[in-house]
């Protein structure tokens, strides 16, 4: 493809699958290549869409030792280069501004499933691992100090039991319970900004849920218990869901769920953003607490036939209450003159809104789709977002960049 006759993009992909006649084993492989030249819409020398070069490869395979067991294997690799800014024929530190990343990602996983009693019960053991090697540059005005390197290793192991019951108290039900352990080791180095960060995150979890299925009503109740090594106490996260479906054309859903974000470094914290030609770094406050969320949502989904046409309307409302919400505040500059923003706990925030999706289709010949979302995100109290001439500027709006 070509954008405005200026920027070409090439894509090539392929896949192949092999399955045994008796379905005892199978494998699927895929490969893709994508290359896009930088796109400068207004000819000012700076890209609106950056340069992209990406290669991916992977496979999924399974083997059934018996009729009631299954082994799954998978592997994926991605080699991706992205660069935005100007002067693409020069090194990043020779340009006026450049944001550049090169990722080499390797991931794989394995699982073992064992069924019994005519597939009504199942035990699953699983594990996965991913390694990411990233080299980056985030800088402006020929900054030699903006190079960085990140090494990230994550692995997960766990087990799960699923049991189908003909009657559990008052209705047929499916019970799910399990244990899981996650480990993440991160090492991020950006010598120009005197940053050498090492972070080890370990999370041990237990989860249970039970889903009752009745003629018109489905009810799901579950909970998760997490022990995060950066949080002193256990985190309890319940959830409940109701689905009411009186007819094939109409259904309504109510959901309550909880969650948390740990006081740790996230991907966006590893970037050094260029604002006004200055580098801006993010650090964590010493007494940072976890961010907790309570989310409520409800929706109605209605389908009908209008002659030869089929129509569908989905209306959804959502509300999320955030406690100890993460906010960023200026705390000055470092020895290199770069701005430092600190992630702290704010007073709280609310995110709420409505979503509307409408579809109209005439078989496979034509389809029209309309979507609309109205959302508002507000802090409970005004939070400081920047300083101008020593004066703190506050806002209740959750800023987005």
Q: Locations of the language-model features?
A:
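Gram-negative outer-membrane beta-barrel transporters
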Residues: 213-216, 313, 317-321, 338-401
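Membrane-embedded beta-barrel scaffold of Gram-negative outer-membrane proteins
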Residues: 14, 29, 122-138, 245, ...
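Flexible loop and strand-edge segments within Gram-negative outer membrane beta-barrel domains
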Residues: 36-56, 64, 68-121, 130-152
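Surface-exposed extracellular loop regions of Gram-negative outer-membrane beta-barrel proteins
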Residues: 22-41, 54, 124-139, 176-182, ...
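Short loop/turn motifs that connect adjacent beta-strands in outer-membrane beta-barrel proteins
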Residues: 20-25, 67-70, 116-122, 164-174, ...
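Outer-membrane beta-barrel transmembrane domain signature of Gram-negative proteins
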Residues: 101-108, 129-218, 351-352
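Outer-membrane beta-barrel translocator/receptor signature
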Residues: 1-43, 50-57
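Structural signature of Gram-negative outer-membrane beta-barrels, strongest in the C-terminal barrel
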Residues: 66, 170-176, 180, 194-321
